[in-house]
Amino acid sequence: MKNRSYEYDVALSFAGENRAYVERVANSLKTKGVKVFYDLFEEANLWGKNLYEYLSEIYQNKARYTVLFVSSFYNKKLWTNHERVSMQARAFQESREYILPARFDDTEIPGILKTIGYINLENRTPEELAVLIENKLKKDQTFFKNRWSKLSTMISPKPFIFTIKVVDEKSQLVKHAKVVLVANNSTYLEGYTDENGLAHFVIRTRKLYTVLIAHSEYPAVVFKSMNPKEDIEVTIEKTNNSGSVIINKSGQIPGISGKIEPVLKSDKNLSVYADNIAIEGGKDQPYDFELNKSIVLEDNKGNIVHLTFRFYQARIALIDFYRGRSM
């Protein structure tokens, strides 16, 4: 089967525990003349390469389709999650199906909706699945023959994946940290670190970003003028009774009831409103504050929190907090 636009007709993404089944699929496809990316077919080619970058390119740009073999093992693997994120970056860009789920079980995969059509592998042999993949490719070849010239003018520039890894001072993974990328034009992307301490972002425009990281048990982190062309690893150190939070427009601070709303006034000064919260012993609101200078808040239950704003732009605030003693 000829493939004029892609290096591979299909790439296979799977957990190692399912290799026996997937290998039979790969061998069956190969005998049919399908150009299939299967890792054991590529051992010599993969030898010595930066696999993080190379596999991202394969699953994002070099295959016409990817078959994602869903199983309970898939979510637990670092490499399969990297492959999935690369696939999804491509899927976001295109209006047609690109990720083809094949399910060993009902495991939920982030970003793969249950409403997406899938193949149930429970009573299907690897050879039968290979026939389905071949039929899918044949239909797609006809579509691209008639439509490629039109589609090529509609597809936007290639997005790419930017990944931030967050660890603590003991090199332990930090899960559920909020990460926000604020562009120099004040647009932003936001996400959270996953079970592997990773936050992935699909970057579609070439801009510099300020990277904000917050977690309820760790202090705030700010990196300014960051070019997302290379992934980064960030180490944060836990401190007692303190943490950080990122709020958009308004939000709550852990350890105190009520909401706060920082604003940029017409005179370019920063101020904050607090709902049912006293600021600095009951000063008038909005209360003017400065970045990197602490202010004291107290709620109606006597809970006290010391706040330090580290960043404010586009209604997004990065805040360190320290829990004081209740009165």
Curated annotation (Swiss-Prot):
SUPFAM superfamilies: Toll/Interleukin receptor TIR domain (SSF52200). The record marks 218 as: Important for ADPR cyclization. Keywords: Hydrolase, NAD. Its EC number is 3.2.2.-. One of its GO terms (molecular function) is hydrolase activity. The keyword NAD applies. The TIR domain alone is active and produces cADPR. Homodimer. This is 3' cyclic ADP-D-ribose synthase AaTIR.
